[in-house]
């Protein structure tokens, strides 16, 4: 809980819970004959929990050349999708990087699919950044997603601002997440 006050102003209060780490998980990397790549995350889901993930890549080429970044959206990756087994998944941002977000309605198995069209030759490595989100962070990310995905906002037919705040006597959000990073998977 965070409480801030000043003389002559109402006291502002916000609450969140820092979540524990992402549950123990296994990861499986796959590549089909069409060049579609996928990473399947299997974990023991916890009731009332919220999760997120993104994929980091690293291509170590000849002469020490290294090409690295996150798999969504970057030039050279033209397709990323998520398996339909995730309940209400959204794609939004944490620290300026796209992240897939889902809640505990997923069945303990989550699949991220992507196509790698980079021309770079070399050793390709992928790893997961896995997030366990507080309920406030999950609600904040969903609100941002709703605002960013609102086709009517640009037409002036609805408010372009997101509508979630967990600040009493104020506006904004106070939320938390924990992050785990998997080992590199080599193609």
Describe each region flagged by the PLM.
Residues 1-187:
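A sequence/structural signal for flexible, mid-protein segments enriched
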């Amino acid at each position: 809980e965070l409480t801030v006050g000043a003389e002559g102003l109402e006291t502002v209060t916000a609450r969140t819970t820092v979540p524990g780490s992402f549950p123990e998980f296994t990861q499986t990397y796959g590549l089909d004959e069409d060049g579609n790549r996928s990473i399947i995350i299997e974990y023991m889901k916890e009731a009332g929990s919220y999760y997120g993930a993104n994929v980091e890549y690293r291509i170590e080429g000849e002469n020490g050349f290294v090409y690295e970044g996150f798999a969504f959206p970057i030039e050279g990756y033209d397709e990323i999708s998520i398996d339909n087994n995730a309940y209400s998944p959204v794609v939004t941002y944490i620290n300026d990087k796209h992240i897939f977000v889902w809640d505990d309605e997923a069945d303990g198995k989550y699949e991220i699919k992507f196509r790698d069209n980079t021309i770079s030759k070399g050793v390709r490595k992928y790893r997961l950044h896995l997030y366990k989100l507080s309920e406030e962070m999950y609600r904040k990310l969903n609100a941002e997603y709703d605002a960013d995905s609102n086709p009517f906002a640009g037409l002036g037919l609805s408010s372009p601002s997101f509508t979630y705040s967990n600040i009493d006597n104020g506006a904004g959000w106070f939320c938390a997440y924990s992050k785990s990073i998997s080992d590199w998977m080599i193609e």
